[in-house]
Swiss-Prot record:
It is found in: Cell inner membrane. It is an enzyme of class 2 (transferase). Pathway: Porphyrin-containing compound metabolism; heme O biosynthesis; heme O from protoheme: step 1/1. Carbon 2 of the heme B porphyrin ring is defined according to the Fischer nomenclature. Its EC number is 2.5.1.141. It holds the Pfam family UbiA. The keyword Oxidoreductase does not apply. The chain crosses the membrane at residues 27-47, 48-68, 97-117, 119-139, 148-168, 176-196, 219-239, 240-260, 280-300. It catalyses: heme b + (2E,6E)-farnesyl diphosphate + H2O = Fe(II)-heme o + diphosphate. The gene is ctaB. This is Protoheme IX farnesyltransferase. CDD domains: PT_UbiA_Cox10. PANTHER family: 4-HYDROXYBENZOATE SOLANESYLTRANSFERASE, PROTOHEME IX FARNESYLTRANSFERASE, MITOCHONDRIAL. It comes from Rhizorhabdus wittichii (strain DSM 6014 / CCUG 31198 / JCM 15750 / NBRC 105917 / EY 4224 / RW1) (Sphingomonas wittichii).
């Protein structure tokens, strides 16, 4: 059983950098990019000011979800080396401030999206925030090793939101992009979990390597990569994108599959020597940036 740990007492007033850290800026970058690509890939364009507003709302909504995640998980963050210096466990901010910030940011983002763009985009944004905070953070993360599988839906919403903001509809292409991110999430996070497993185990988070072991995790990474690759090339196969996307996505997905296979067949047990796992984790981030970039490039250049 994991030892108990609590955030240290707040010693100083939080500054703007602490509030920014609550939004998880690194995660925010990918979320905003996929939302922006969903907006640009839509068949009809919108005024640049409205487009900027839509992307801003996606960023604020994702930031709100990140803040509420850190509010709820302050005790876990205090036990994990990679999160111990976050504002709450480090004592630079009190939990009530984080809660108020997250709730306020979330409400503002949804209201602004609804008033400036349309109700559908605002509704999907609201669902994405609630899904990440309630379903993933509060309900799943501490209870099941499948937490990241189901919770992965939260990170898959931005492309849907961007498309809906531009069109007021949800159509096949953004749904396929949603499926792609949903299926990408387990290999991405399980690759990370393999080489920081001790952090999760110390905090008592039932990530797959800690519960089912390394071998089962490696197999699951390969099993999820196959349908992810199918989802990645499906837009081209269905005639929703052109050759620019299709060829690029096929090559990138083949490389992803190769890296996943290297992880799957690896017998390395020492986290410090897990090069294949680190390669897959690093490439998986680049992969998603490039895939979504290809969606936009295909529309602009075709």
């Amino acid at each position: 059983m994991a030892s108990k740990a609590h955030p240290v007492a707040t010693t100083a007033a939080a500054d703007w950098r602490d509030f920014l850290a609550l939004t998880k800026p690194r995660v925010l970058t990918l979320v905003v990019f996929t939302g922006w690509c969903g907006l640009l890939a839509a068949p009809q364009s919108i005024h640049p000011v409205l487009g900027f507003t839509a992307v801003l709302c996606i960023a604020l909504g994702a930031g709100a979800a990140g803040a509420l995640n850190q509010w709820y998980e302050a005790d876990l963050d205090a036990m994990m080396a990679r999160t111990a210096n976050r504002p709450l466990p480090a004592g630079r901010m009190d939990r009530q401030s984080a809660l108020h910030f997250g709730v306020g940011l979330g409400i503002f983002s949804v209201l602004l999206m609804g008033l400036a763009l349309n109700v559908l985009a605002a509704a999907i944004l609201a669902v994405s925030i609630l899904f990440y905070v309630v379903v993933y953070t509060i309900w799943l993360k501490r209870r099941t090793p499948q937490n990241i599988v189901i919770g992965g839906a939260a990170g898959a919403f931005p492309a849907l939101i961007g498309w809906a903001a531009a069109t007021g509809r949800v159509e096949t292409l953004p749904v396929l992009l949603f499926a792609l991110v949903f299926l990408w999430t387990p290999p991405h996070f399980w690759a990370l979990a393999l080489f920081i497993n001790s952090d999760y185990a110390r905090a008592g988070v039932p990530m797959l390597p800690a519960v089912a072991g390394q071998r089962a995790t490696r197999i699951q990474i390969m099993l999820y990569t196959v349908p992810m690759v199918i989802a990645a090339v499906a837009p081209w196969a269905m005639g929703l994108t052109g050759a620019i996307y299709g060829i690029g996505a096929s090559l990138l997905s083949a490389l992803f599959l190769l890296l996943a296979a290297q992880v799957g067949f690896s017998r390395e047990a020492d986290p410090a020597r897990m090069k294949a796992e680190r390669r897959l984790f690093g490439f998986s981030i680049l992969y998603l940036f490039l895939i979504f970039g290809l969606v936009v490039a295909d529309k602009v250049l075709a």
